[in-house]
From Swiss-Prot:
The protein's name: Methylthioribose-1-phosphate isomerase
Native source species: Meyerozyma guilliermondii (strain ATCC 6260 / CBS 566 / DSM 6381 / JCM 1539 / NBRC 10279 / NRRL Y-324)
GO annotation, biological process: L-methionine salvage from methylthioadenosine
Gene expressing this chain: MRI1
Pathway as given in its UniProt record: Amino-acid biosynthesis; L-methionine biosynthesis via salvage pathway; L-methionine from S-methyl-5-thio-alpha-D-ribose 1-phosphate: step 1/6
Pfam families on file: IF-2B
Keywords per UniProt: Amino-acid biosynthesis, Cytoplasm, Isomerase, Methionine biosynthesis, Nucleus
Catalyzed chemical reaction(s): 5-(methylsulfanyl)-alpha-D-ribose 1-phosphate = 5-(methylsulfanyl)-D-ribulose 1-phosphate
Length: 390
């Protein structure tokens, strides 16, 4: 499969482009990132998003900043790094990358001295992320197979996804969606060597920014992985119908897993991710509490690289949650469609004007509601006391 390329960094000419994700799925256009200011704007406006991707873009932007000589001293560079880090505070990957670049500055007195160090760091960050995503995919598939075998499950099954965690959120392949990609390759009806097969993906729309509807469906369609889009508030009905062997759009494949990404995982396993993830986990927990046997059990899986794990923070109570502008909830922006042809972009209202709005970008799912955390190193499960050891 050929995956989408959200980040283009020319290592010879030292230029950076990103795919403008605000225009997807109706057009694919790349933006030039000339330095830190451009990267800050792109990250803040969510033209690029996803914890691994914003760390990579931020790091490459610092390289381009030095190369283009937008700054004249180490002190100016340090100030630019501080500014960049403030663009999205919840995602730990960007903060970690900025801290590592600060350490590379050391006692250097010239920009020429630090340029190669930062260049090498940014390139390694990109390459490692891509390699690690494939490992996450492989580890995730092993976990799916082990779980279904332990239940003596047979026949088709389906997976729920949330937000966007694929090539558009990383250097490529993806984290949670990377597991889906790897799973479909290994466990589609045509390829599966097991008594079960992956029949369908259900991406949640993911309000209010609709990354699931716009981005995840774009990736799944691009790679010809079968899917059916659902609204966030359809999850309970979907699980109930599929487990009662009722058709959903002519498909009978019980939901067995939700696979989500993470913007920050803290020491005890509490996980910050796109708003609504906690709700999804609570729904899974509710169904598991009332299921009639192990064959009916659902698994809530978090997929993320080790760089997303923040061992300095003890619990999710200490995670700073970014709040987004009210208009992202009260309006929608998109092109006017005429016979599926995209025309001029318009902003339309979907709520009463002048109202109070609360619009947090993330929530924190308690570790008690997470069945496993899949990384490039291993799959973490809780011990007998219900604790993670990350």
């Amino acid at each position: 499969m050929t995956t989408l390329e959200a980040i283009k960094f020319d290592r010879t000419n030292v230029t950076l482009q990103i795919l403008d994700q605000l225009l997807i799925p109706y057009s694919t256009e790349y933006l030039n990132i000339e330095g830190v200011d451009d990267a800050y704007d792109a990250i803040k406006s969510m033209q690029v998003r996803g914890a691994p991707a914003i760390a990579i873009v931020g790091s490459f932007a610092i390289v381009v900043e030095i190369k283009n000589r937008h700054i004249s001293s180490i002190d100016e560079l340090a100030a630019k790094i501080d500014y960049l880090e403030s663009s999205r505070p919840t995602a730990v990957n960007l903060s970690n990358a900025c801290n590592e670049i600060r350490a590379l500055l050391g006692n250097s007195e010239s920009l020429d001295e630090v340029y190669k160090r930062v260049f090498d760091f940014a390139v390694a960050l990109y390459d490692d992320d891509l390699s690690n995503n494939h490992k996450i995919g492989s580890n995730g598939v092993d976990y799916l197979v082990e779980s279904l075998r332990s239940q003596n499950f047979e026949g088709p099954f389906s997976i729920i996804t949330y937000c966007n965690t694929g090539s558009l959120a990383t250097s490529g392949h993806g984290t949670a969606l990377g597991i889906v990609r790897s799973a479909y390759k290994a466990l589609s009806k045509e390829n599966s060597k097991e008594k079960f097969w992956l029949e369908q993906i259900y991406p949640c729309e993911t309000r209010p920014y609709n990354q699931g509807a716009k981005l995840t469906t774009f990736e799944l369609k691009y790679e010809k992985i079968p899917f059916t889009l659902i609204c966030d508030n359809m999850v309970t009905s979907l699980i109930s119908r599929t487990h009662n062997k009722k058709q959903v759009k002519d498909i009978v494949a019980p939901v067995k897993f939700a696979i989500v990404g993470a913007d920050r995982i803290v020491q005890n396993g509490d996980t910050a991710n796109k708003i609504g993830t906690f709700q999804l986990a609570a729904i899974f927990d509710s169904f598991n509490r009332r299921n009639t046997g192990p064959r009916d059990s659902l698994k809530m899986i978090v997929a993320a690289p080790r760089t997303t794990i923040d061992l300095k923070t003890t619990t999710g109570d200490d995670i700073i949650i970014e709040e987004r502008p009210a208009n992202e909830l009260t309006t929608l922006k998109g092109p006017i469609l005429r016979k599926d042809v995209a025309g001029e972009k318009q902003i339309v209202g979907v709520a009463t004007p002048g109202i109070q709005v609360w619009n947090p970008a993330f929530d924190v799912t308690p570790h008690e509601l997470i069945d496993s955390i899949v990384t490039e190193e291993k799959v973490y499960a809780k011990d007998k006391e219900g604790n993670y050891h990350l």
